[in-house]
Amino acid sequence: MVPRLLRDSGWRHRTPDEGGGLGVLLVPGFGFGDRSLVLASAWLRARGYRPAPARIGLNVGCTSELVDRIERRLEEHVERTGRRVVVLGQSRGGWLGRLAAARRPDLVRGLVTLGSPVLDPLGVSPRVVRAARALTRLSALGVPGLLDEDCFTGPCYHTNTASLAAELPPSVPALAFASRLDRVAPWELCQDPSAECVEIRSSHTAMGLHPDFYRILRPKLAAWAAADDLAPSPV
């Protein structure tokens, strides 16, 4: 998939003035780090955007704690760029970004999700759920920085599930990518009712490497950049 993307004329074409310096915070998926979005970062930078990593490690921590960290990164990137920023998240990173956008719409210009099961994060592949639950057992043994049982059955789970079920504020437009070929996050669970939903033909992990993703994303991001205000909106 990577060679195909690198050969694609739409991906290789550089338009350094298109983004106008609009910031984009990149949030990786469960079990992946910031380097998993390095090609997206390069594509954004070549078009005049200012991408920044979320710096949440491998995205295996407590949901509420990770949203707190994403919020702080949003604040930093808004301060750095002087205006609201776009959140672009893959899989779990997408719905974590949605939680942060719902909490702080004053910081978010738009939201892009790739294979993010916002309608039911626990409705993903049983294999992934088993891996996540294994982390809670390690957490119970004292290993820090991991999901815990509260993220599955306690206040953390219930609070964040309710937030995901709520509509996004009108000031935060959203674009949700999903694939019927996705064997990790079912296509139906990625249909965010607050977003413009777009279908592409891709596996779950290769979605951010698909030329169609960039072809569809480009005009949307450019429109957000062109119409953006230069300062964060009031809460």
Where are the model-predicted features located?
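Generic hydrophobic, helix-prone segments enriched in Leu/Val/Ile
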Residues: 1-6, 70, 131-132, 187
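Serine-dependent carboxylesterase/thioesterase catalytic core
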Residues: 22-30, 35, 39, 45-54, ...
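Helical cap/lid subdomain of alpha/beta-hydrolase-fold lipid enzymes
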Residues: 102-103, 109-235
